[in-house]
Every structure is written in C-alpha cells, then in structure tokens.
C-alpha cells in the first residue's frame, strides 16, 4: 500500500513540475486568533496551529465536519466514513476526545452528561462555519480543563454586506441523502445579524456489518436540524456586544453491537446561548463572554429508555494589553460550572490566568504564562506554558513549546449514577514540542515539521470499583505538513502523522505497560492536488492512506484484540461557478474505488462510493 501511494504521489507531482507560472503560499503570514487570544501572524507565535479556510469549507459541500477534520494532520475522527449517523470519536495526536477542547467563536462547548464531558460532533453543522483553527499541544494556561492535546476553535460566518444577503445550499447524494441550508445576513454601521437554518437527512446504511449478506439488516438513518441567530450591536466604535442563540437536534437509529442488528433509536439536542462583548481602549481590548450549553440525550433499546441532561455555564473576562511595542500580555478570570440532573449535582472551577508575549530581539519571541485553578471538589492545581520561537529572514521559524495541562474529573465521574468517585483528582499532563516552519523556493514551497512528547498522570479509568485515578499515559510522535504552489493554477498539499503510545497500569502487584492506541493508526497520510482550471472551474483530488490499527472484539468474553487492516480512499471534487460566482454547481465523489473491506470500528460498516451533487447560491 505504501509503495502504491508513493508511486501515485510522485506521478502527480512530476506531472506538474514543468508548469511555467509561479505563485506563493502564505501560511506564515496568516493571521490567527486562537494561539494567544489576540490577532497574530503565524510567524509571530511558537505554537503549532493549522487553519481550515473558508475556501476549503466552501469546497466541502458533500462532507460533514467530522470528515473535514479527519483530513488534517494528527487528527483521526473514528466514524467519519462509517454510517453517517454513527457516533464520532475525535483523536488528536493519539489522545481521546476528552483531552481536546472544542470552542465555538472562542467559547467552550461542553456536555457534562457525556463520557468525560466530551462534546458530540453530530450536533455541529458545517454549513455556517467560516473557518476552523486547530491549535495543537497543551493549551490549559489560556483555555483551562480538557485542553491537553489541543484546542479546535470553530469560527462562525460573519455578515459582510450592507444590504441583506441570502445564501443557500442544496445537495442530494448517495443513501438518499438530502441537505438544505438557508442563510440571511446583513452588516450596517450599528447592527449586524446572521440567521441560519439547516436540514440534513439520510437513509444511511446498517451500522452493524452483516458478514453473511443474508441477514437483511435494516438501514440506520439519521436526521439533523439546526438554527442559529447571532446579532452584533455596535454601541460605539469602541464597544460592541453580540448575543446569540443556537439550537441543534438530531435523531436516528443504531444497532446493538458488532455484527448485531437491533431496532434501537436515539436523539440528542443542544441549546447554546450566550453573549460576547468587547471594548477597545488605547492600549488593548477587554472581552467579556458568557456561554450556556444545555444538552439532552435519549437512547431507546430493548433495555428501556435512558435519558441524560447536562448543563454547562462559562463566564470569562480577559484583556489583551500592549505594555510596549515589544511586550504584550493577556490576563483573565474564568468561571465554569457543570451540572447533571441524575443525580442533581453541580461542580465548578474558578481560574485566573496570565500570559506574557515578548519580542526579545530581532526575530526572537517568547510566550510565558500560568493558570491557577480552584475546583470546588478536589481543590487547587496550576498549569504553565513556555513557548520561545525564532524567525530567521522572515521565512524560517524555529519553535519549542514546554507546557503543562490538566483535565478536571467530569461531574459524571465524580457524582454520576455509575461508578462515581467524589475523591478523584485532576489528570495532569506535561508536553514538549519542537519543530520548524519555513517557506522556500520564493515561497512556493512551505512546510512544517513538528515532534511532540506527552505524558498524562493520574489517568482516570473505570475499574472494578468504578472510576479511579490510576494509570499513566505516554504518547509521542511527529507531523509533517507541506504545500507547494506549482503555478497560479495548481497546488499540491500533503500531510503525514506518526503517533505511538502506551499506558502503564499501576496495579497492586506490579506495573504493566503496553500499546493502547485503539483504532488509531501509527501512520496516516493525506495528499491533495488542487487545480483552478479557469476563473470558474475548480477541481481537486485527494488520497487518504490510513495504516493498520488494533481494536477489541466484544463478541467474545473477555474481549480479545483484533488487527484492523490499513486502507486507502480516493476522493474527487469539482465545482463550476456561474453568474459572477453567485451560483456554484458541484459534485463530490468520495471513496471513488468503492472500497468497503475495512473497518473503522470492528464489526461495523463503512460507506462505499458516495456521489453528492449540489448547488451554492446567493441573492
């Protein structure tokens, strides 16, 4: 498989090297906001950050957010190519999803009723997202609990026109899948608004795999609806506040287990509301944000109905302030509370934090910060970050990150109905990163190389007596991201990720250490070729190569380990714009070779070839 991939890659690259016109890639000049909570060029921060642009999202009309994230270096979304309604598990640099913090416009998303407080990606729609910033490595100093492996900041679309603008999307594809999206927005001097609605439905496929081909497993469909309303009110040219309300719900069917059909049903809903505000003063900006998430889940099976409710409050005030041309700081205070209804229990955490950014000399910069956390149950803990970087001739950035992080035990783990333990302590991590980012060949070729090492102590596991702090997790790996602008029309991008890890079980008799990255490949590669044929026609092709993995076979007791073969998926997209780009017709073909002889999860189906056609339009 690796040999075939290299041959394809060489052929694709070689066929384009004779192109005559030059262009550049400009990732180092790209402005991001997630790295340090203020706008900053990537060349000025030592943190590892990847941006999914609005153009890339626009060209993903046939995908959902899990499939888009699954294309990024170091990210595996297990379930992205399985039944559309199947639960999704996000792994960032080998860490499970409870160690990655999701933000929506800078405000955390959290479901206290979920396992480990993890947020369900199926509650998010890709259709009102402007861009996504992926910040890798421990970020607990600025973002608090769960930001151990990294932070993913989902940034919603903003109004851009003085007159009301209506945009829409209609798609139809395989498995009788339909999606419709409508968006109305306007931006004036005083008021701006963005109203969005999406409806998405599919018949899907059977979640469980029928190895006999004769059992006639039923299809497990999925339906999602989401609405969003965001207002922006400019009280003065220095003070602005934005109330928002988002509601999302989905329902569908799921099967009993590996290779086992069942008429089970599930539903979930999210009410997400709050307020963001900012005040600009002479040397900086003050922000005050509030967010509230209410998540409800309902599972119905032969064992009856199971309902969970989770409520999450987030209040944060912070300022970014310029002390001088070369010294900048961010200082803030954050309060969060987590509540479940069965039993009725609330946890809270209060955290002041401070981070300094220094431009020490020409090309040299550093970030140094700390965060103190007071939890109403376990007490206090502290995290720190140190991120020096050096920019050479504006085209080579060298960086080192030395950080600590933490994950507070969830309210479910502390006081939930199953195996809870009120004496749990926070999981604590230490992460080291080093690498370089550079642009060469007149900035036509840009690449980033990063190595990381992460250890997590006091890992919370579910043992014979319920939840307990017991084990130690150690993960390490490397990532490569490269982009080459062949000419003004053709670009080639590739990313590669390697991750390895092991857990040390601290048992009463002796410690046991073994590889435990279930469903995560050691090697993962994505290759993209993009071709702007002319000002109206865009074509892209991508190849995903996923290495072999391990999983557990739960059809036997005790569960036994099974090997999952590696696989390669080839996708093609084409879009054609009309009427001064107010109308775009597109086709998205996923898994063009119809490969179905692999598993993401042992015993569960994957999608074969899936053709989606659709239109983007604006009035």
Task: Give residue ranges: language-model regions.
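Conserved C-terminal beta-signal and adjacent last beta-strands/turns
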Residues: 6-9, 19, 233-234, 400, ...
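Periplasmic-side early beta-strands and strand-to-turn transitions of outer-membrane beta-barrels
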Residues: 153, 161-163, 171, 186-266
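N-terminal periplasmic accessory domains that precede
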Residues: 65-68, 88-91, 100-103, 119-124, ...
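Outer-membrane beta-barrel signature, preferentially recognizing the C-terminal barrel domain
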Residues: 260-276, 280, 377-378, 387, ...
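Gram-negative outer-membrane beta-barrel transporters
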Residues: 360-362, 453, 470-554, 593, ...
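Extracytoplasmic beta-strand/coil segments of soluble accessory domains associated
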Residues: 66, 70-108
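Short acidic/polar hinge/loop motifs at secondary-structure boundaries
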Residues: 108-136
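N-terminal periplasmic "start-of-domain" segments of outer-membrane beta-barrel proteins
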Residues: 30-58, 89
């Amino acid at each position: 498989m690796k040999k075939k991939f290299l041959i394809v890659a060489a052929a694709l690259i070689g066929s384009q090297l004779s192109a005559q016109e030059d262009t550049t890639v400009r990732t180092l000049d790209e402005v991001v906001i997630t790295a340090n909570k203020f706008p900053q060029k990537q060349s000025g921060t030592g943190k590892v950050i990847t941006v999914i642009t609005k153009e890339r999202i626009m060209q993903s009309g046939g995908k959902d957010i899990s499939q888009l994230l699954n294309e990024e270096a170091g990210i595996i979304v297990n379930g992205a190519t399985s039944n559309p309604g199947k639960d999704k598990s996000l792994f960032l640099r080998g860490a499970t999803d409870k160690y990655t913090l999701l933000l929506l416009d800078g405000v955390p998303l959290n479901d206290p009723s979920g396992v480990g407080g993890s947020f369900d990606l199926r509650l998010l729609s890709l259709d009102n997202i402007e861009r996504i910033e992926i910040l890798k490595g421990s970020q607990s100093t600025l973002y608090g609990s769960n930001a151990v492996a990294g932070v993913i900041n989902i940034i919603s679309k903003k109004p851009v026109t003085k007159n009301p603008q209506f945009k829409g999307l209609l798609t139809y594809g395989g498995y009788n899948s339909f999606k419709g999206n409508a968006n109305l927005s306007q931006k004036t001097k005083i008021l701006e608004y963005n109203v969005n609605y999406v409806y998405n439905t599919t018949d899907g496929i059977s979640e469980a795999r029928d190895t006999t081909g004769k059992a006639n497993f039923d299809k497990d469909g999925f339906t999602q609806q989401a609405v969003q309303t965001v207002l922006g009110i400019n009280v003065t040219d220095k003070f602005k506040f934005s109330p928002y309300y988002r509601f999302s719900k989905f329902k569908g069917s799921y099967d009993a287990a590996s290779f086992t059909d069942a008429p089970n049903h599930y539903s979930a809903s999210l009410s997400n509301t709050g307020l963001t505000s900012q005040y600009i003063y002479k040397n900086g900006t003050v922000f005050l944000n509030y967010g509230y998430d209410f998540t409800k889940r309902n599972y119905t099976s032969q064992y009856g109905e199971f309902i969970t409710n989770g409520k999450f409050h987030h209040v944060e005030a912070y300022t970014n302030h310029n002390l001088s041309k070369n010294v900048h700081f961010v200082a803030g205070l954050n309060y969060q509370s987590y509540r479940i209804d069965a039993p009725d229990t609330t946890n809270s955490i209060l955290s002041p934090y401070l981070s300094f950014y220094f431009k020490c000399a020409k090309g040299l910069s550093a970030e140094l910060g700390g965060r103190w956390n007071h939890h109403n149950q376990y007490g206090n803990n502290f995290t720190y970050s140190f991120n020096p970087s050096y920019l050479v001739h504006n085209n080579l950035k060298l960086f080192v990150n030395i950080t600590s992080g933490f994950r507070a035990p969830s309210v479910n783990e502390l006081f939930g109905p199953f195996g809870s333990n009120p004496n749990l302590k926070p999981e604590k991590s230490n992460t080291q990163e080093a690498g370089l980012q550079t642009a060469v060949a007149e900035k036509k070729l840009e690449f980033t190389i990063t190595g990381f090492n992460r250890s997590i102590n006091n890992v919370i596991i579910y043992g014979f007596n319920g939840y307990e702090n017991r084990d130690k997790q150690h993960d390490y790996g490397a990532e490569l991201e490269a982009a080459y602008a062949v000419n003004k029309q053709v670009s080639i991008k590739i990313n590669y990720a390697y991750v390895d890890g092991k857990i040390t079980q601290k048992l009463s008799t002796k410690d046991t250490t073994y590889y435990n990255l279930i469903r995560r490949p050691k090697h993962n590669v994505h290759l993209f070729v993009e071709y702007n044929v002319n000002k109206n026609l865009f074509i892209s092709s991508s190849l995903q190569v996923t290495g072999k993995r391990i999983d557990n076979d739960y059809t036997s007791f005790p569960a036994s380990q099974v090997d999952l073969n590696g696989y390669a998926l080839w996708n093609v997209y084409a879009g054609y714009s009309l009427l001064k780009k107010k109308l775009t017709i597109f086709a998205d073909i996923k898994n063009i070779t119809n490969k179905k002889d692999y598993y993401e999860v042992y015993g569960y189906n994957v999608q074969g070839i899936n053709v989606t056609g659709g239109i983007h339009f604006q009035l």
